[in-house]
Amino acid sequence: MRAAILREYNKDLSIETVSDPECPEDGVILKVLACGVCRPDWHGWVGEHPRIKPGQIGGHEYCGEVIEAGPRATYKKGDRLVAPFILSCGSCPTCQSGAGHTCPNQRLPGFTEPGAFAEYVAVPFDHNLARLPETLSPTVAAGLGCR
């Protein structure tokens, strides 16, 4: 797949061919339909965000269509979904108390793992995802998952 990768701070992102993501058992692979650009992306691009390092595929506000679902996933191929910025595990005591936004096992696409500045993105913990109505365009929906 093609992806936009940060190779150097303050330089253009590099469009490269990289391996397709592997599908998580409890998640999905989305074909990215739209991905926004947010202030934290800019902070990473200029080297001011401690979690975004050269080599990272950014993109944390996105939506897509399921092309593959893991065996423990609740969504199926063809579903259109939007993802939040913070993917909580859903099973730790913090998540069980309703504070998933502070989950110690959280995953942050575009920060702690490859994001959606790519053709495809792996999304673990699919309980975080939300189905998109057919009437909502991907470009409008993409920003809904950002904080």
Label every PLM stretch briefly.
Residues 5-12:
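Extracellular beta-rich ligand/substrate-recognition surface
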